[in-house]
Amino acid sequence: MLVFTKKYFTSDGILKDEYILNFHRILGDMPTAGHELRCYYDVLAFISEHQDAEHRRTIVAKHFKDGIDSPIFKSTLNTDLYPYQREGAVFAVRVGRCLIGDDMGLGKTIQALAASELMAKLFSIRKALIVSPTSLKYQWKTEIEKFSSRSAEVVEGYSGQRQKLYKNDSFYQRLPEHSEC
């Protein structure tokens, strides 16, 4: 067990960075001496987050060799994006999730749609859930249908109605703010 521990962990008992992405190797090499091996959910979630992040970095490096001037943007939306919007979309794709905090009127909606469309192309995501103020629910639907080739579903109504809407095939779904749920 000592040899195993020295190979995979620091002297403080922390998993060495180079093994985070190959955690399955650790599980395979771990001597159990006939004992049950238990790995808790939070550990697996932590490892999964790191593996997902590395996968995103690899895909972004492959498809955005020219950075914000990469050709993938030409077929992303039915409009051209400003350089800062492309930058925001690439950032969102690379990190997986983020808040876009630009000033009013600078195209946060377009950046979010571009990021969603890029994630659909690159990672095969099947749905995007948009949470926005109630006053903007149909504005989002209009913008989605204007700038993308997809439909959008506003998820609203009583619980049973919402459950049916969640099962809809629409790529974009707009969720009402908490007070409506």
Task: Identify the residue ranges that each predicted region occupies.
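Short, locally clustered residues in the helix-turn-helix/winged-helix DNA-binding domain
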Residues: 93-94, 117
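Hydrophobic anchor at the beta1->P-loop junction of P-loop NTPases
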Residues: 100
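Walker A (P-loop) ATP-phosphate-binding motif of ABC ATPase nucleotide-binding domains
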Residues: 97
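SF2 helicase/translocase NTPase motor core
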Residues: 17, 64-81, 87, 106-181
